[in-house]
């Protein structure tokens, strides 16, 4: 089974080797049809501390690394300066 992958934006990098990534999920309301945006935050392992706030990143699922950390950084898609 392939590991899950997500694309999101780094909202915090204040922890050592850990970043917080916010991922938006857009879906239509079942009755009214309005587009509803839901945001979920994931703690992600960043081994080299190379991400900054505002970077767009791809993350992938991994084994549990701590109580709340189950994702690792796959790649940096774009930095805040280039977005």
Swiss-Prot record:
One cellular component (GO) term of this entry: cytosolic small ribosomal subunit
A single BP term in Gene Ontology: translation
UniProt-recorded Gene Ontology molecular function terms: rRNA binding; structural constituent of ribosome
Protein keywords: Ribonucleoprotein, Ribosomal protein, RNA-binding, rRNA-binding
InterPro entries: NA-bd_OB-fold (IPR012340), Ribosomal_uS17 (IPR000266), Ribosomal_uS17_bact/chlr (IPR019984), Ribosomal_uS17_CS (IPR019979)
CDD domains cross-referenced by the UniProt entry: Ribosomal_uS17
Entry superkingdom: Bacteria
Coiled-coil annotated spans: none
SUPFAM superfamilies, per the entry: Nucleic acid-binding proteins (SSF50249)
Nucleotidyltransferase found in the keyword field: no
Complex formation: Part of the 30S ribosomal subunit.
Membership in a protein family: Belongs to the universal ribosomal protein uS17 family.
NCBIfam families linked to this entry: PRK05610.1, uS17_bact
Biological function: One of the primary rRNA binding proteins, it binds specifically to the 5'-end of 16S ribosomal RNA.
Name of the protein this chain belongs to: Small ribosomal subunit protein uS17
Taxonomic source organism: Trichodesmium erythraeum (strain IMS101)
């Amino acid at each position: 089974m392939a590991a899950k992958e997500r694309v999101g934006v780094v909202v915090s990098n204040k922890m050592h080797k850990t970043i917080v990534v916010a991922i938006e999920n857009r879906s239509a309301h079942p009755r009214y049809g309005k587009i509803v945006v839901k945001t979920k935050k994931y703690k992600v392992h960043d081994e080299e501390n190379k991400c900054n706030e505002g970077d767009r990143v791809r993350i992938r699922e991994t084994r549990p690394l701590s109580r709340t950390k189950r994702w690792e950084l796959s790649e940096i898609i774009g930095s805040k300066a280039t977005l």
